[in-house]
């Protein structure tokens, strides 16, 4: 069951949303807090969040090409509420079911799928996207400032980010 520290970030349909996140997480065999953490980092758990640079939309920042692969558009995703959009979150992440063994694997499924289940020294890059470009576009991930981002750096960033977030959550 998902943690209470995400409650303040879920703006609508809170009980139904949490129940659906729990259900999706069970189907994907992942911790629901991992999924909520990724949505919090990507969109502040806002289904109408839009990245002004990439036009990515929604809870996990669906790129236009990804939306098309999933049989929808970013415009349609933008019009959906949080419950409706979770169907597409599941549809997208189901591609990686059985491969997501950590928070970083869930995050990388969204941010850089080729890195899922790779060794910690795996450098994020492709034949058309250099390690240096990824590092320059995502400086928070290049922790050692060496012009490349490794899976270990993503893991470190996520753990530090999560610790900071937990410190800012209200305590019961």
Language model region names:
Residues 2-144, 151, 155:
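Catalytic glycan-binding domains that act on GlcNAc-containing polysaccharides
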Residues 154-172:
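Low-complexity, Gly/Ser/Thr/Pro-rich intrinsically disordered linker/tail segments
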């Amino acid at each position: 069951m998902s943690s209470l520290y995400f409650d303040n970030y879920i703006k609508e349909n809170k009980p139904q949303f949490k129940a659906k996140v729990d259900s999706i997480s069970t189907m994907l065999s992942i911790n629901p807090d991992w999924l909520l953490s990724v949505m919090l980092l990507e969109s502040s758990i806002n289904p109408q969040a839009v990245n002004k640079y990439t036009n990515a939309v929604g809870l996990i920042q669906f790129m236009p090409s990804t939306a098309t692969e999933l049989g929808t558009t970013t415009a349609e995703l933008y019009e959906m509420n949080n419950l409706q959009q979770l169907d597409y979150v599941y549809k997208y992440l189901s591609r990686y079911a059985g491969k997501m063994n950590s928070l970083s694997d869930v995050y990388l499924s969204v941010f850089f799928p080729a890195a899922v289940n790779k060794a910690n020294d795996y450098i994020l890059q492709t034949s058309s996207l250099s390690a240096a470009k990824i590092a320059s576009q995502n400086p928070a991930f290049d922790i050692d400032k060496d012009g490349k981002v490794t899976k270990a750096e993503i893991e470190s960033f996520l753990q530090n980010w999560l610790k900071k977030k937990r410190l800012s959550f209200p305590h019961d």
